[in-house]
């Protein structure tokens, strides 16, 4: 019997590219990957939609379809690259692009765009999307969803493990070795989002390559302490956040007109990410075990070095150790979530999101081949 194949799609809070992964399960194997750059104009529209200002409905509708088309084209490129027919794909799992994540209001909501109808129509492949809102409807945060996949992939009774996904926002998963204990996961706060935004504003570069610019600056201790005093960092899980909360306006408010050398701000923002993560790791009182890194931030050598220092005695590694490059783990996660949905299995963990119960997540947009 041929192995089942799924495709995972993600555009994270960093908005640098669309990540696509073609995955085979039982056992899990990545067949091919493809990163599709987001065109400048589309990225500009996405950034505008994801800020705290009011935006027009026509702009959102047009961007939704444009992003869906880009996702669909990225899938076709991936299939061509892998020399695989669309008929052999069970489903696509598409996270979309988050433009609002507001889990704590009177009527909590989260909104991801990247029209799955367009993806299914372009590719002919059944597409599963809108994974977060069912969890929210059950009283959960709708995020993070990755811990359920981390549990499937990395839980091990030989040691306690922490999985840190450093995207625009960083999220941490605790996988206890004790099978009687529940997995815990939450957003720790900013990952790359402030680093990238500050770099773009000051150097006109999308990101600080390997953290070299930050490494040349001096950490401003008083400012780090002020930033870490933000109430979110003291809030116990379940919790989740986004760039609606942690953005340049938040940073400027904390700077309060005080002037710093831009490179020192970059160094301080790396320290904010590293210390906020390390503080969360300490809460698990682990005197041994490992911290596994994934996401784009795993390529920031300066940040990784700070985590190694601050998170001792944990062994710090990356998901490369199990054969999955850190850049692709989240895309693989959404391929797995699509599989869970089509197999009528839950995709959330109430111990992570705070939902009343586990649930089958997502909506299904049928392709040309109806297997279910």
Curated annotation (Swiss-Prot):
Q: Which reaction does it catalyse?
A: 1,6-anhydro-N-acetyl-beta-muramate + ATP + H2O = N-acetyl-D-muramate 6-phosphate + ADP + H(+)
Q: What is its EC number?
A: 2.7.1.170
Q: Which GO terms describe its molecular function?
A: ATP binding; kinase activity; phosphotransferase activity, alcohol group as acceptor
Its pathway is:
Amino-sugar metabolism; 1,6-anhydro-N-acetylmuramate degradation; Cell wall biogenesis; peptidoglycan recycling
**Keywords in alphabetical order:** ATP-binding, Carbohydrate metabolism, Kinase, Nucleotide-binding, Transferase
SUPFAM superfamilies xref list: Actin-like ATPase domain
- Enumerate the residues binding ATP: 12-19
Q: Name one GO biological process term.
A: peptidoglycan turnover
Superkingdom per UniProt = Bacteria
NCBIfam families linked to this entry: PRK09585.1-3 (NF007139), PRK09585.3-2 (NF007148)
Q: Family membership, please give it.
A: Belongs to the anhydro-N-acetylmuramic acid kinase family.
Give the protein's function.
Answer: Catalyzes the specific phosphorylation of 1,6-anhydro-N-acetylmuramic acid (anhMurNAc) with the simultaneous cleavage of the 1,6-anhydro ring, generating MurNAc-6-P. Is required for the utilization of anhMurNAc either imported from the medium or derived from its own cell wall murein, and thus plays a role in cell wall recycling.
State what protein this is by name: Anhydro-N-acetylmuramic acid kinase
What species does this protein belong to?
A: Coxiella burnetii (strain RSA 493 / Nine Mile phase I)
């Amino acid at each position: 019997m041929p192995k089942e194949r799924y495709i995972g799609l993600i555009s994270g809070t960093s908005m640098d590219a669309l990540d696509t992964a073609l995955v085979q399960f039982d056992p899990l194997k990545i067949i091919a990957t493809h990163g599709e750059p987001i065109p400048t104009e589309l990225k500009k529209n996405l950034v505008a939609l994801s800020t705290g200002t009011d935006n027009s409905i026509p702009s959102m509708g047009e961007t939704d379809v444009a992003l869906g088309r880009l996702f669909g084209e990225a899938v076709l490129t991936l299939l061509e690259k892998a020399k695989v027919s669309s008929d052999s794909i069970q489903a696509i799992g598409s996270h979309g692009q988050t433009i609002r994540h507001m889990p704590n209001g009177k009527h909590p909501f989260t909104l991801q765009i990247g029209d799955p109808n367009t993806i299914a129509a372009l590719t002919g492949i059944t597409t599963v999307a809108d994974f977060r809102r069912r969890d929210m409807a059950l009283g959960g945060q709708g995020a993070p969803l990755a811990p359920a996949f981390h549990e499937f992939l990395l839980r091990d009774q030989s040691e306690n493990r922490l999985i840190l996904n450093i995207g625009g926002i960083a999220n941490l998963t605790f996988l206890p070795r004790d099978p009687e204990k529940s997995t815990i996961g939450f957003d720790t706060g900013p990952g790359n989002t402030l680093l990238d935004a500050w770099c773009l504003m000051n150097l006109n570069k999308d990101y600080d390559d390997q953290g070299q610019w930050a490494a040349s600056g001096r950490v401003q201790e008083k400012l780090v302490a002020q930033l870490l005093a933000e109430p979110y960092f003291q809030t116990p899980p379940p919790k989740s956040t986004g760039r609606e909360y942690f953005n340049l306006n938040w940073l400027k408010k904390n700077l309060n007109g005080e002037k710093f050398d831009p490179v020192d701000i970059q160094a301080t923002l790396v320290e904010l990410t590293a210390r906020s993560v390390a503080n969360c790791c300490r809460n698990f009182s682990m005197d041994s075990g490992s911290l596994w890194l994934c996401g784009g931030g795993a390529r920031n050598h300066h940040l990784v070095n700070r985590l190694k220092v601050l998170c001792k005695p944990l062994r710090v590694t990356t998901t490369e150790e199990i054969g999955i490059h850190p850049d692709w783990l989240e895309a693989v996660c959404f391929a797995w979530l699509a599989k869970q949905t089509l197999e009528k299995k839950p995709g959330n963990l109430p111990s992570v999101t705070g939902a009343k119960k586990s649930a089958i997540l997502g909506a299904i947009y049928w392709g040309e081949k109806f297997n279910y």
